[in-house]
Amino acid sequence: MSSNNPRVFAMVAGEISGDILGAGLIKALQKQYPDAKFVGIGGPRMEALGFESIFSYEELAVMGIVEVLSRLPRLLKVRATLIDELVKTQPDCFIGIDAPDFNIGLELKLKNRGIKTVHYVSPSVWAWRPKRIFKIAKATDMVLSLLPFEKAFYDEYQVPCTFVGHTLADDIELESDKAQARELLGLDKEAEYLAILPGSRGGELKMLAEPFVKAASLIKLRYPDIKFVTPLVNQKRRDQFEQALREHAPDLEIHLIEGHSREVMAAADCILLASGTATLEAMLVKRPMVVAYRVSPITYRIAKGMMLTKRYSLPNLLADDDVVEELIQADCTPEKIAAAVATQLDNDFTPMYDRFMQMHKGLRCDASARAADAVIKLVEDNV
């Protein structure tokens, strides 16, 4: 592509967290390339910046091995169409944002056709399926990692990797304001709140809404004055959660809010949440938390056989320590969840707070700017 033509960047982001990262990267790249074009699969935040989506990013929001298999024909068709479109477009660079099972195969095909490729957000090769690093080495010109310990892993295998920090650590203030968050959301200024976050995907709510609302009922028995608040990403997830409430806790009152998950966490005294990126946000707003997760039994058996780490949540992985309680699969029961939340409500939070603050500072690196700088260097290098 001639240097006189506007740069073209192709991206694929598969869920909300990827949409946030993609939007930050687009903003940073637009400072260097104001006329750049951005195409691929992105979410609403990316599209608000002019990103042109070829498919809806909901296409990629699939959890679990069994669940992916049921959608595999459609996912393969989406990927094949994308490859055809991007080979015609010949972007200056393709950036796959997370969604490794979809993006790494796509990156390999594009790299073999002469397109520079970047994978933004390292897959958890240090935790499970470590042999993926050899495919990553073939598929990408560079990995952009969010977590500091990941670069050392890639360096060991001589795979180009740049640690950029995490955009969430940049966006979230070191001290979050509980009173301000409650005012924004219209919550009681004095009440004790438990935030309940059962995930953003339909599959997550299918597995977690029931144990979470049953646990909330048990917590209400022990703490009669406690209040509950739950953010849900859209009307579909709200309908799902309300159905679970009707079936499993019809008398329980939970304040439901569309979006604003970060503000809900900041407003809370304690957080019960699904394992995932939200655990990092909970750590960054510095609230005590309990992490719980379960998937289909078949998915769990397959995944467990490939795991290299016994920890799941990002705070525990970052700390290399059991900082927050994790209740996974068989332990994800209403009784165990309620007991773990009670422990957090009753105990001194100071030691956990201090660990959270230390980790927050370590991730605060102006990640979008660093990621953009690495992409720009790759694009401008014509060797």
Curated annotation (Swiss-Prot):
GO cellular component, as recorded: membrane
Alphabetical UniProt keywords: Glycosyltransferase, Lipid A biosynthesis, Lipid biosynthesis, Lipid metabolism, Transferase
Cross-referenced CDD domains: Glycosyltransferase_GTB-type (cd01635)
Record has Ribonucleoprotein as a keyword: no
A GO MF label: phospholipid binding
Reactions mediated catalytically: a lipid X + a UDP-2-N,3-O-bis[(3R)-3-hydroxyacyl]-alpha-D-glucosamine = a lipid A disaccharide + UDP + H(+)
EC assignment: 2.4.1.182
InterPro entries given in the database record: Glyco_trans_19
Pfam families from the UniProt entry: LpxB (PF02684)
Pathway of action: Bacterial outer membrane biogenesis; LPS lipid A biosynthesis
Alphabetical GO biological process terms: lipid A biosynthetic process
Keyword Cell inner membrane assigned: no
Gene3D superfamilies found in the cross-reference section: Glycogen Phosphorylase B
Similarity section: Belongs to the LpxB family.
Listed HAMAP family: LpxB
Task performed by this protein: Condensation of UDP-2,3-diacylglucosamine and 2,3-diacylglucosamine-1-phosphate to form lipid A disaccharide, a precursor of lipid A, a phosphorylated glycolipid that anchors the lipopolysaccharide to the outer membrane of the cell.
Name of the featured protein: Lipid-A-disaccharide synthase
